[in-house]
């Protein structure tokens, strides 16, 4: 029986009950993850090594880099991907435990409500991630970062630091914002698909 639960959970995660949900899984699981894993590493992989300040000393560079990046973009986006997956995973675990097939989810009022709640939670998490990303990284990466070095007891309170490949990072940052907006729109469209399909089931003649 436990193997059947795992099978149902696995199929639910890969094949949601809606067409838009299946496209979202493909887009989310393939394109977005590939973009972050491959291109994200290429753009941000050696950022800390090439981040240099004036004067160019390791202690100062590390201090200012930690000020420039309270959290690295790769870690933030990886956490975003995992967090947004949680509501859907919890729902499909519930469906697997209740032995609800994917084809039956939208036929049952209670499971439909739970599924809509999971989609709404995904929207909320994506909006929250968008806000956090804008707060942490902004929308443009400037080539110069003015670092406050007061905590190091330096004569000068500000050190000028060079941000490597700032233009590439701006492009990548814009792409991640775009991915977030696309997934939000897909989730909204999925809710409309669910509502239309439920109306279709309710309007079917009784046999």
Curated annotation (Swiss-Prot):
InterPro entries: Connexin, Connexin_CCC, Connexin_N, Connexin_N_sf. The keyword Lyase does not apply. It is found in: Cell membrane. Disulfide bonds join 53-161, 64-147. Residues 44-74, 133-175 are extracellular. One of its GO terms (cellular component) is connexin complex. A connexon is composed of a hexamer of connexins. Has significant hemichannel activity. However, has only low-efficiency gap junction activity and probably does not function as a gap junction channel in vivo. This is Gap junction epsilon-1 protein. It comes from Danio rerio. The gene is cx23.
């Amino acid at each position: 029986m436990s193997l059947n639960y795992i099978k149902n959970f696995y199929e639910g995660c890969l094949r949601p009950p809606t067409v838009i949900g299946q496209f979202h899984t493909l887009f989310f699981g393939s394109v977005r993850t590939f973009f972050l894993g491959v291109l994200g590493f290429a753009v941000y992989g050696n950022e800390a090594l090439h981040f240099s300040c004036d004067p160019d000393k390791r202690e100062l560079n590390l201090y200012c880099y930690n000020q420039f990046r309270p959290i690295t973009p790769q870690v933030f986006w990886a956490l975003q991907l995992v967090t947004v997956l949680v509501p859907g995973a919890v729902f499909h675990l519930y469906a697997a435990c209740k032995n609800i097939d994917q084809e039956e989810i939208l036929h049952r009022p209670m499971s439909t409500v739970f599924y809509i709640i999971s989609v709404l939670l995904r929207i909320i998490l994506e909006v929250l991630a968008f806000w956090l990303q804008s707060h942490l990284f902004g929308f443009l990466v400037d080539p110069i970062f003015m670092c406050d070095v007061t905590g190091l007891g330096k004569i000068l309170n500000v050190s000028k630091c060079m941000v490597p490949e700032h233009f590439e990072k701006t492009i990548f940052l814009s792409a991640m914002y775009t991915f977030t907006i696309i997934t939000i729109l897909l989730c909204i469209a999925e809710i409309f698909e669910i509502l239309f399909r439920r109306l279709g089931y309710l309007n079917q003649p009784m046999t």
